């Protein structure tokens, strides 16, 4: 890429705004039919990351027009308390979606607890059944909000996916695997990379789109990319030395070399609550079907 060519910064705010405006109209239609979409957030303790995302969810809900309630359990909550909480949320006909703030504290068996959440109210792909539906490409499956935010961002900026070689760095059930499945469903040719991948540099350079969700600050630098690529950075890491949030991509190194990239913060993360809202509205719409 010549020094005269500027790479495009793919910001999340315009994507979230477009989704929010569309959802607000859908919520008005639901309210006219006597349905007010409602999300319940289940949070154990007061981790700062959880509280930050919770505030963002409330802000998005206000813009879209649906209700949110938080059930806060103490840090030392028992397994039984957590299980019963999900039972109650599942049984409440006025609740359409539930967002469990994960990971749970060490003393809680997350898998056991989430078996008590009704899959139709799972709006962030926390349950095994919703994850399976996402990985299998089942119509109507609600994938992890962050994974779907990646697709929403690529669509908004009209990044071609059909037939395109795409590399995903990371294979977690929260982002890596689901985003690979979503991309594959769009007929991209997907390679999933991880810590055991041989010659990661060569693999990534062959891709037209690279999605990085490894959870390691500045893992991907200039050596891993080439001109013409679109780089999607899903990572959110705290850089203690710089005292700021950074991604899994070293943006200073990578941005001048590629065609397009997402910033951190301000990229994928800012679309995630809009996808959460979309899922809550979709769950509410299904109650009328």
Task: List each model region and its residues.
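Positively charged, low-complexity intrinsically disordered leader regions
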Residues: 1-35
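N-terminal glycine-rich anion-binding loops that anchor highly charged ligand groups
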Residues: 29-39, 45-63
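Glycine-rich phosphate/diphosphate-binding loop of Rossmann-like nucleotide-binding domains
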Residues: 44-58, 140-230, 234, 239, ...
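Short beta-strand elements in bilobed, periplasmic/extracellular small-molecule ligand-binding domains
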Residues: 61-76, 190-192
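Short, well-structured alpha-helical segments in soluble
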Residues: 81-93
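Anion-binding alpha/beta catalytic cores of soluble intermediary-metabolism enzymes, centered on
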Residues: 97-161
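Short glycine-rich anion-binding loops that position phosphate/pyrophosphate groups of nucleotides
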Residues: 101-107, 216-218, 236-239, 267
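Rossmann-fold NAD(P)-binding glycine/threonine-rich loop
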Residues: 111-132, 235-288
């Amino acid at each position: 890429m010549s020094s005269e060519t500027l790479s495009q910064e793919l910001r999340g705010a315009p994507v979230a705004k477009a989704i929010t405006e569309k959802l607000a109209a859908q919520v008005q239609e639901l309210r006219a039919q006597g349905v007010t979409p409602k999300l319940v957030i289940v949070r154990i303790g007061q981790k700062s990351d959880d509280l930050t995302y919770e505030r963002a969810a409330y802000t998005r809900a206000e813009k879209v027009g649906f209700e949110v309630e938080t059930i806060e359990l103490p840090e030392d909550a028992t397994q039984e308390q957590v299980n019963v909480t999900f039972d109650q949320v599942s049984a409440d006909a006025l609740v359409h979606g539930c967002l469990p703030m994960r990971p749970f504290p060490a003393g809680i068996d997350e898998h056991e607890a989430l078996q008590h959440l009704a899959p139709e109210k799972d709006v962030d792909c926390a349950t095994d059944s919703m994850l399976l539906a996402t990985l299998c490409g089942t119509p109507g499956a609600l994938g992890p909000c962050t994974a779907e935010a990646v697709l929403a961002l690529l669509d908004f900026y009209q990044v071609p996916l059909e037939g395109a070689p795409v590399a995903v760095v990371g294979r977690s059930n929260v982002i890596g695997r689901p985003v690979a499945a979503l991309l594959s469903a769009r007929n991209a040719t997907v390679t999933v990379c991880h810590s055991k991948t041989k010659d990661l540099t060569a693999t990534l350079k062959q891709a037209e789109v690279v999605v990085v969700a490894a959870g390691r600050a500045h893992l991907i630098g200039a050596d891993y990319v080439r001109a013409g690529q679109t780089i999607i950075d899903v990572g959110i890491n705290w850089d203690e030395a710089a005292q700021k949030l950074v991604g899994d991509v070293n943006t200073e190194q990578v941005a001048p070399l590629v065609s397009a990239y997402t910033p951190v913060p301000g990229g994928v993360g800012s679309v995630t609550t809009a996808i959460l809202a979309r899922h809550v509205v979709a769950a509410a719409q299904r109650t009328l079907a």
